Amino acid sequence: MSMVRDLFLFCCFTGLAFIDLYNLKEENIKEFFDEGEWIVIHRQKTGTEANIKLLDYPKQIMEKYRGLCEDGRVFPVPNYQSCMDSLKRLGKKCGITKPLSWHMSRHSFATSVCLSNGVPIETVSSMLGHKDIKTTQVYAKITKEKLSKDVEKLSQQINNIEEFTFGNVCNDNTNTINGRV
């Protein structure tokens, strides 16, 4: 059950669908120009390329299981039904009332990990391997916290622009045009 937990969390931080996790091979882990490790795959569902930079937490999970597969796969992923059964037990053990699904990890990556932290939707779309940004927009339900943070940032930016400060508007003594009021 702990392996299924780790795999689910790996997907929460990479956005991989179950089948793409199952098929993930060492050859899909690449080092790019930024010297970071990236997952580069063609999604089974769409054939679209997905490029996902590995954050520290999924790297740690990957290292925990590396070398356990002899067929080049990164993880020894059990079959889908076995994973779903374990996921249901994990949810109950954690007091989660809504039944967990593997797709929830992908959704969590898109919303909680990326969009809520300011990652542009175009970038999220690329990482998820979507063909059309409209597909990604399904995930883009904004949280109240994100909305509040964004409006506060906007307010600070506007307040930093001297022309728009309330004081300059009210203290302007140029209320005359050609000497007339």
Region annotations inferred by a language model:
Residues 1-18, 68:
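Basic, Lys/Arg- and aromatic-enriched nucleic-acid-binding interface segment
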Residues 2-5, 77-80, 97-117, 130:
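Short basic/aromatic active-site micro-motif
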Residues 9, 13, 19-20, 89, ...:
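C-terminal catalytic core of tyrosine-transesterase DNA break-rejoin enzymes
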Residues 14, 23-61:
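Conserved tyrosine-mediated DNA breakage-rejoining catalytic core shared by Y-recombinases
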Residues 28-34, 97-98, 118-138, 149, ...:
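Short, polar N-cap/turn motifs at the start of nucleic acid-interacting alpha helices
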Residues 43-47, 80, 128-153:
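Catalytic-site neighborhood detector that most strongly recognizes the C-terminal catalytic loop/helix
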Residues 44-63, 69-89, 101:
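C-terminal catalytic core of Y-nucleophile DNA break-rejoin enzymes
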Residues 154-181:
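C-terminal secondary-structure termini that scaffold catalytic or DNA-interacting sites
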